[in-house]
């Protein structure tokens, strides 16, 4: 409500916020007829695929780190209430509403977008590699030759990611990857290092140590 008031927006255009698991009603007759189904109850879910995936984390522990790894990667933990202070501001960590009134305390990171765009570029050049083939290429080259910051502005827009990676490495005085395997290895290892850095920021902000990361 404070944000709505600060922006001078009419409150009436927004829906009510309801707890996850709340009964939302029953499917209308029109929808049931269209889908050829019987009337059924509708329940409010967590409202976002990442939050829904978090519910499925196979642990009963309170302290864990989750990694939702898709086009974007979201890495964080679950807290009983939002954590907002100078540390979280400095680390650019966000709080999102989660299941059961809890807060998802997480970092947004560019994820497999880099792999997807790299594959798309090579397809344009006439080389249609499967993701499995790309993984094999990455496994067969020397590790830790060069790194990028996946969140650098260089890699946000669609386009020729392999060439941008080479330009980034050249500009930062690193080994410049040439082969497809080297490009892919650079992406995978850079993402892994970014995840480690994000996990350390989560620990810094919460004052806790986490011994498990769940990929959801």
What label would you give each PLM region?
Residues 13, 209-216:
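Short, intrinsically disordered, charge-balanced linker/junction segments flanking boundaries
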Residues 5-22:
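A conserved helix-loop-beta module that forms one wall/lid of the active-site cleft
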Residues 1, 5-6, 29-212:
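Active-site core segments that coordinate phosphate-bearing ligands/cofactors
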């Amino acid at each position: 409500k404070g944000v709505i008031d600060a922006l001078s927006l009419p409150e009436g255009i927004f829906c009510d916020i309801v707890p996850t698991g709340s009964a939302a009603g029953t499917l209308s007759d029109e929808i049931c007829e269209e889908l050829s189904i019987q009337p059924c109850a509708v329940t409010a879910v967590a409202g976002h695929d990442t939050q829904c995936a978090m519910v499925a984390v196979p642990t009963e522990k309170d302290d864990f780190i989750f990694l939702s790894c898709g086009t974007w990667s979201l890495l964080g933990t679950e807290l009983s209430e939002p954590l907002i202070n100078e540390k979280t501001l400095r680390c650019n960590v966000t709080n999102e509403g989660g299941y059961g009134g809890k807060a998802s305390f997480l970092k947004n990171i560019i994820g497999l977008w880099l792999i997807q765009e790299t594959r798309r570029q090579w397809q344009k050049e006439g080389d249609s590699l499967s993701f499995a083939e790309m993984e094999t290429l990455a496994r067969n080259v020397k590790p830790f030759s060069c790194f990028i910051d996946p969140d650098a502005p260089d890699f946000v827009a669609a386009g020729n990611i392999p060439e941008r990676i080479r330009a980034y490495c050249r500009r930062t005085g690193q080994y410049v990857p040439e082969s497809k395997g080297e490009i892919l290895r650079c992406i995978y290892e850079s993402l892994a290092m970014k995840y480690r850095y994000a996990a350390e920021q989560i620990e810094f902000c919460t004052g806790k140590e986490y011994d498990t990361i769940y990929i959801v």
